[in-house]
């Protein structure tokens, strides 16, 4: 029997049709939708008089555009309202389950699907959103797709996909105090570069990954796309099964036992071939923070901003110089000396209950600076409810934060939560691109 990687096992088990050029049509187990990338796909279905092939394997929520201050689809502007109205109409017409803003479970799609047990090991999962790689934390092959592909999956429950190369990143060592999963993946991206994963599906492994919680694993896989990888994967283990047990959409009874038998096979074979293998020791790692305008422009909190004049690559030198200009920063200075205007705790990367607990622990009995506007946006209604039951909302409010409703919020500038021109934010989100959180906004 040929040894296979985890990626190869999932890919091969979902092939509906194999073409002679090495590409394949894959069956899709779960299709996630939101209000921004789906309207045109539904319009195309209507124009071609097609139905949704598997509405029971399709799920929708509102997250990108929603207001986090009031439950009202008109609160984020006319375009946002139109997109949300279209999602309601489309889901009703095609019989697709929807968590709208009035549903107590509404929230970020990449938070909801795992916490409800929709995301399961061995699945193929797609969504019209680049951070779909989050679901790879469960040993699922998950990736973002474009609007035309959204239409294709709606119509056929399949998708044409080429076979990507395999990369293994083994993270080893001992986690230093105050270092989080976000620090670890930012460090990896900083060491390898924001294009290092191009053409690959990355499997993360090693003792550090093995000992991570599911929510920490989701943070790591969420950021795989920031290395330009197609997807990120972590093999399921006992912690995965424990997380999924008794979730609403998880298998139950005899089906649970059968599922467990299958899930336990979902790991790379001992002699499986990887096109690239990298080992990263994080034993001496300090908390990380980005200084530039892409995630690989990152340093330890106690380091100085690099001197771009010392960078050998002309491309990287120009990029660093441009980033410093946009960010209003100078080489050889410390970010700890730079004042911020806003703080955002939230996003598909870091808006789960463990993230909020960690932040609340730091903020307890402390006050933020008076000039700083800070918001906490839970990733879902369930996360919000749990946090309030634990009193975390009171800790945040007492420290000076605003406690908001679930949504993507400042992870992207598609709603009213954004940076004004020239404002600087410390953000829990996944991207620090120019204008990502608002035109002229500066994100760390």
Swiss-Prot record:
It catalyses: (2R,3S)-3-isopropylmalate = (2S)-2-isopropylmalate. HAMAP family: LeuC_type1. PROSITE patterns: ACONITASE_1, ACONITASE_2. InterPro entries: 3-IsopropMal_deHydase_lsu, Acnase/IPM_dHydase_lsu_aba_1/3, Acoase/IPM_deHydtase_lsu_aba, Aconitase_4Fe-4S_dom, IPM_dehydratase_rel_enz, IPMI_cat. Its cofactor is [4Fe-4S] cluster. The gene is leuC. GO terms for biological process: L-leucine biosynthetic process. This is 3-isopropylmalate dehydratase large subunit. Heterodimer of LeuC and LeuD. Gene3D superfamilies: Aconitase, domain 3. Its EC number is 4.2.1.33. [4Fe-4S] cluster binds at residues 348, 408, 411. Catalyzes the isomerization between 2-isopropylmalate and 3-isopropylmalate, via the formation of 2-isopropylmaleate. The keyword Nucleotide-binding does not apply. GO terms for molecular function: 3-isopropylmalate dehydratase activity; 4 iron, 4 sulfur cluster binding; metal ion binding. Residues 423-444 are annotated as: Disordered. SUPFAM superfamilies: Aconitase iron-sulfur domain. Pathway: Amino-acid biosynthesis; L-leucine biosynthesis; L-leucine from 3-methyl-2-oxobutanoate: step 2/4. Belongs to the aconitase/IPM isomerase family. LeuC type 1 subfamily. Binds 1 [4Fe-4S] cluster per subunit. Keywords: 4Fe-4S, Amino-acid biosynthesis, Branched-chain amino acid biosynthesis, Iron, Iron-sulfur, Leucine biosynthesis, Lyase, Metal-binding, Plasmid. It comes from the Bacteria.
């Amino acid at each position: 029997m040929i040894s296979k990687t985890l990626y190869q096992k999932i890919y091969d088990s979902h092939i509906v049709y194999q073409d002679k050029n090495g590409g394949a049509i894959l069956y899709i187990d779960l299709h996630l939708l939101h209000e921004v990338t789906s309207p045109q796909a539904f319009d195309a279905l209507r124009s071609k008089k097609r139905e949704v092939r598997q509405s029971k394997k399709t799920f929708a929520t509102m997250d990108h555009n929603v207001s986090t201050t009031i439950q009202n689809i008109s609160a984020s502007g006319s375009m946002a309202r139109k997109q949300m109205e279209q999602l309601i109409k489309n889901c009703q017409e095609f019989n697709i389950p929807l968590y709208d803003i009035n549903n107590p479970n509404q929230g970020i799609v990449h938070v909801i699907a795992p916490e409800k047990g929709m995301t399961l090991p061995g699945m193929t999962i797609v969504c019209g959103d680049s951070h779909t790689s989050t679901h790879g934390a469960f040993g699922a092959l998950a990736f973002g797709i474009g609007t035309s592909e959204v239409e294709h999956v709606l119509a056929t429950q399949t998708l044409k996909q080429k076979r990507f190369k395999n990369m293994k990143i083994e993270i080893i060592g001992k986690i230093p105090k105050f270092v989080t999963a976000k620090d670890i993946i930012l460090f990896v991206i900083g060491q390898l570069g924001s294009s290092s994963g191009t053409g690959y599906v990355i499997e993360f492994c090693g003792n550090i990954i093995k000992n991570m919680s599911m929510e920490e694993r989701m943070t790591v896989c969420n950021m795989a796309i920031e290395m330009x990888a197609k997807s990120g994967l972590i093999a399921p283990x006992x912690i995965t099964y424990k997380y999924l047990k008794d979730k609403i959409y998880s298998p139950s009874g005899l089906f649970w036992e059968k599922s467990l038998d299958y899930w336990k096979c979902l790991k790379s074979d001992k002699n499986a071939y990887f096109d690239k293998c990298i080992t990263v020791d994080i034993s001496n790692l300090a908390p990380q923070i980005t200084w530039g305008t892409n995630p690989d422009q990152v340093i330890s909190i106690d380091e100085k901003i690099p001197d771009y004049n010392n960078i050998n690559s002309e491309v990287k030198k120009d990029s660093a110089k441009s980033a410093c200009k946009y960010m209003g920063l100078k080489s050889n200075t410390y970010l700890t000396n730079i004042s911020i205007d806003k703080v955002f705790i939230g996003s598909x990367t870091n808006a789960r209950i463990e993230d909020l607990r960690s932040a609340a622990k730091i903020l307890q009995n402390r006050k933020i600076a008076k000039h700083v506007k800070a918001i906490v946006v839970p990733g879902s209604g369930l996360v919000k409810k749990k946090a309030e039951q634990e009193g975390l909302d009171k800790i945040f409010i007492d420290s000076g934060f605003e406690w908001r409703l679930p949504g993507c919020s400042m992870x992207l500038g598609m709603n009213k939560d954004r940076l004004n021109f020239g404002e600087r934010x410390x953000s829990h989100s996944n991207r620090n691109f120019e204008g990502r959180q608002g035109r002229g906004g500066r994100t760390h």
